[in-house]
């Protein structure tokens, strides 16, 4: 029985139709596999051909569009167009490809040229290139620009900036050929340099400068608060005040206080516009002058309705140096006249006062200092012992944690006595120049800033002692600000200043600190 079934299966397997069907299935599968392989090979061939075409494509040259030279259509309906371009420094007229629409090409725009010098495409207008400052805008839309060296040239507007407002002193980017303005750069605003605030410092917060405060009150406060009397006596208020003297003695505080007092007297919030001279210096021609103009424009905007505005220029000697000295790159030859022009215009602004501060009045241009400009000059000197006592008491008060049994007056007096000693323990250096010798003591360089720093040092020592030992009183470690800690603070200040003198040029150090070599002996 089993043998018969085996025989039937063998006979079926040898059936020609079944064998043919099986072979057809196998051939069909092979055919599908070959078709897929052929498709993949064809796709890879297309990719390789595309890459090869890309690699073999000729380079395209970038140029700058000037204008469409000609565009017409012949009797067969074929368009013929050409354009004027700038290729480097050469002007050329080249044909346009039929795929390029002439109406979409604007002056200053980038175009692409093939090997046959045919415009085949357009590209984005570049936004990088040489930077220039606008000196003048002509009636026909052209611009006169200048570079860093002051060299001037005439340029046209690219179509991208044809309707963009461009003013004098704006900074623009031009194309490499120097023909078109491609873009306008954002301006550095004077507000970025100005510290605009309403001061809360009054004259009562300033110690040791009674004479200087009285003079600036007479020069500034009286004209603002008694205008009718000044008009009656045909007396004009000063345009400006110069505070000069060694650093750290309250020049900025005085300027803030006068702004506060003027505001209190007028009933309006006064504005204190503060800027440091070096911040206005800029290597680009005309930029410093533009910033000066913008500062005075801002003062004019803020003034009005009796609102007093103080324009305070610190380190004025760095901005308004004497012209022709050769000390710098002579940028002051244009900055000083611009400042004087703005200062002369202050007379039309009843509520604006210019106050300058400088450590080196000898470096400021004489035209700035003459009567009618910075009329009032106030020398802010170093404090003597009486003034030092008044200043110290502003920072060392009875409200602070003090040594038991001592009050602020006693500690301040001890500080001043130690600081003004003229013995070896407070001798900073002995300077010798051409046979002239002078001993420099701490008393010679004392300033309001130094006094505050000494008090802050003593406070820091007291805080560290509290942290280290806790709030529990110890007989060997008195709590609070003690006389011993004040003397330690003076010693620290002494060591710091002595090392500073030894590491700097003595002559320059003397000039900065407003000192001279008096003949103390040879």
Swiss-Prot record:
Q: Give the residue ranges for region: Disordered.
A: 1-26
- What domain of life is recorded for the organism? Bacteria
Q: Which GO terms describe its biological process?
A: modification-dependent protein catabolic process; proteasomal protein catabolic process
Coiled coil segments of this chain: 20-57
| Keyword terms, alphabetized | ATP-binding, Coiled coil, Nucleotide-binding
What the entry lists under SMART domains is as follows:
AAA
Matching entries from Pfam families are given as: AAA, Prot_ATP_ID_OB_C, Prot_ATP_ID_OB_N
Q: Which GO terms describe its cellular component?
A: proteasome complex
Q: Which GO terms describe its molecular function?
A: ATP binding; ATP hydrolysis activity
Q: Where does ATP bind?
A: 248-253
Q: What family does this belong to?
A: Belongs to the AAA ATPase family.
Q: How does it assemble?
A: Homohexamer. Assembles into a hexameric ring structure.
Q: Which NCBIfam families match?
A: pup_AAA (TIGR03689)
Name of protein: AAA ATPase forming ring-shaped complexes
Q: Which organism is it from?
A: Bifidobacterium animalis subsp. lactis (strain AD011)
Gene encoding this chain? Answer: arc
